[in-house]
Design a protein with these regions (language model features):
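Nucleotide donor/acceptor-binding cores
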Residues: 5-6, 206
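Active-site and donor-binding regions of nucleotide-sugar-utilizing enzymes
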Residues: 7-12, 18-29, 69-171
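A nucleotide-sugar donor-handling region in carbohydrate enzymes
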Residues: 12, 45-47, 149-222
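Cofactor-binding loop segments of dinucleotide-utilizing enzymes, especially the Rossmann-like FAD-
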Residues: 13-14, 40-43, 130, 179, ...
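A generic structural motif
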Residues: 31-37, 62, 239-244
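Conserved nucleotide-sugar phosphate-binding/catalytic loop shared by glycosyltransferases and other
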Residues: 35-79
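Short internal beta-strands
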Residues: 37-42, 153, 243-250
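Donor-nucleotide binding loops and adjacent catalytic segments primarily
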Residues: 191-270
Length: 270
């Protein structure tokens, strides 16, 4: 009798988590025992965040659903309302696709939505990135909840695997796999500083990289925190004679305020 092919429904909502997910689903789709399908949602469908759906499509995955649930209101209500919309749409997709596993990463809206839908629809939930911790943000308890609701766990460090076992997860379901994104770093062709400098249009002999995301516990402070950060980096850069490059924030409430501070700094330096 032929062995049944297992359906894996992977869910991705932002480029940072797709970077972790990619090596896993890329390997799985090459295995004759698995059929890999993707749900693409969230920031991937946002022009403001680079419309990264096109990158996923260029990777030639079978995208079975695009869920545009992101509410860019810059208010505390946006993530909770967005999760509700995502759960509703994802439930319909799971009912249609009927996967054997739902595969997801981390601690964002997609993660908790996958955890809830998988459990209520009797589908095995496979979670990557549990056991980690972050302070001052909703992501920490959300990640913990995802771990409690997941059936199989892949952690990025042995310490995180131990953390899951300490909170009661069965050791036989917890696997220390390392961070899959390390494979991407290994596989990316090397590029010289000269080439990067030309692309970014500044000197990379001495440089600093700045990135700041808003905290859910201090959303109202986001603008002032970023202004203070930029002032400090500006002073430091002048003292040390280095260049600084900034990266835009994520989609969380407060991100518009951080972006406003960046745009103001950009205007002042022109």
């Amino acid at each position: 009798m032929a062995k049944k092919i297992k359906k894996i429904l992977a869910v991705t909502g932002i480029r940072s988590e797709y970077d972790i997910l990619f090596p896993v689903i890329d390997s799985l789709r090459k295995h004759k025992s698995f059929q890999v399908q993707l749900v693409v949602c969230g920031a991937h469908l946002s022009d403001w965040h680079g419309d990264t759906l096109k990158d996923i499509e260029s990777d030639k995955f079978d995208v079975v659903e695009k869920i545009d649930y992101l509410l860019m209101t810059n208010r505390k209500t946006q993530r909770a309302k967005g999760i509700g919309n995502l759960i509703s749409s994802l439930t319909q997709t799971v009912d249609r696709i009927k996967p054997d596993f739902i595969l997801y990463v981390g601690d964002r809206e997609e993660s908790i939505a996958c955890s809830i839908v998988a459990n209520y629809m009797n589908v095995l939930a496979v979670h990557i990135g549990g056991g980690d911790s972050v302070y001052g943000n909703a992501d920490d308890p959300i990640r913990f909840a995802c771990s409690e609701l997941a059936h199989v766990h892949f952690t990025t460090s042995q310490q995180y695997a131990d953390n899951l076992i300490k909170i009661g997860e069965e050791p036989r379901r917890v696997f220390f796999s390392g961070n899959p994104a390390l494979k991407n770093i290994k596989d990316v062709p090397s590029i010289s500083k000269k080439e990067i400098s030309k692309k970014l249009d500044f000197n990379l002999n001495k440089y600093a990289v700045i990135i700041k995301h808003p905290l859910s516990s201090s959303k109202e402070e986001s603008y002032y925190q970023m202004k203070t950060t930029l002032e400090a980096v500006g002073e430091f850069s002048k003292e040390r004679n280095i260049e600084a490059v900034g990266i835009f924030p994520n989609t969380d409430p407060g991100s518009y305020d951080i972006l406003r501070a960046i745009k103001e700094e950009e205007s002042n330096s022109m």
